[in-house]
Structures are given as C-alpha cells and as structure tokens.
C-alpha cells in the first residue's frame, strides 16, 4: 500500500497533477483532442489524488474497496492538440462519510490557459457488498486535512452549474 504517512502533499491547495501529454491517437477528425480523452486526463489526475488520500489501486487490492464516479459535469472551453502538455488542478469542495465532491481544471502547462473543467461526485464502494461504504478512519482523516486546506480556496465560479437553454422571450 502507498505510504501516506507524510501529509504535506495533502496541503497543496489546490492539488496540482504531474504534467501529462496529449497523445497523437487522442486527436479526432476535427484536429483537436477528442472529448472522451479530456476525461482520461481528469481521471489520471484524480488517480494521483486518490493515491495521496490512500484510496488508490493498491487500496482496492488490499481492502476490497474503491472509488466510483457517480456524476460528472464537464465544460469544454478551449481546444488542445497533439503533443500539448497539460496539468490538472483538483479542489476538494466537500466530503461526507461515503462521498467526495470535487472540482478539476485542465490547464495547458506552458501557456496556462484553462481548457476544460470537470465537477464530480464520487462514491466510496465496498466491492464485495456492491454498495457504498464508510471511509475507514485513516482515509477520513486525510480527507479532513485536505478539505481544511482546500476550504481556504475560493469556490470555483463554475461549481454547481447545470446545463440549460433559456427560452427566448
């Protein structure tokens, strides 16, 4: 299991992922990053966060519990192209005994522009019982540390948005 005894990285507010590269195979016939691969980048970034809080791949193997995404709202704001280097920020907006609510931003690493956002609700799941489960105390503690750090950040303007098409008068 990952050694999470040093909580220092949890205090990064927001968490910033490692740099990732837009792969050539991810480009669609419009010449830019296909919408599905934005989620690959967001998912890889959240895997880094999950390792920090102790619910990564090794956690699933050791404890038979994992995280499932229950809902996601993605906004595509600016195109990315093959070879672009990107990074993702992660802000924990809230959590309870079984759920995480977080907001991610995908930025071009060199130019800094915001390319996409993704707001997510994730569930902690016991794979044997096939239902949600309480976070164990060690994970709950790390989540509390992260949330305390992230609570100092302003809430993203786009958090809580919904899709709508207002009717013209």
Cite the ranges covered by each PLM segment.
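A positional/architectural concept
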Residues: 15-32, 36, 40-43, 63
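HotDog/MaoC-like acyl-thioester-processing domains
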Residues: 1-18, 80-85, 92-169
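A broad, structural micro-motif
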Residues: 33, 67-69, 115
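Hydrophobic beta-strand-centered segment that forms part of the acyl-chain substrate-binding groove
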Residues: 49-100
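Residue-level recognition of the GNAT/N-acetyltransferase active site
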Residues: 23, 77, 108
């Amino acid at each position: 299991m990952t050694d999470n005894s040093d909580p220092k990285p949890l205090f990064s507010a927001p968490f910033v992922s490692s740099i990732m590269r837009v792969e050539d195979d991810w480009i669609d016939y419009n010449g830019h990053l296909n919408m599905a691969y934005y989620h690959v980048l967001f998912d890889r970034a959240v895997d880094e966060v999950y390792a920090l809080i102790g619910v990564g791949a090794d956690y699933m193997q050791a404890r038979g519990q994992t995280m499932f995404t229950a809902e996601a709202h993605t906004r595509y704001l600016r195109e990315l192209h093959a070879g672009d280097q990107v990074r993702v920020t992660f802000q924990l907006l809230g959590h309870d005994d079984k759920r995480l609510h977080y907001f991610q931003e995908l930025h071009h690493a060199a130019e800094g522009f915001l390319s996409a956002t993704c707001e997510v609700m994730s569930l902690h799941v016991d794979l044997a019982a096939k239902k949600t489960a309480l976070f164990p105390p060690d994970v709950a503690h790390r989540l509390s540390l992260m949330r305390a750090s992230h609570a100092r950040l302003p809430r993203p303007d786009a958090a809580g948005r919904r899709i709508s098409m207002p009717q013209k008068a």
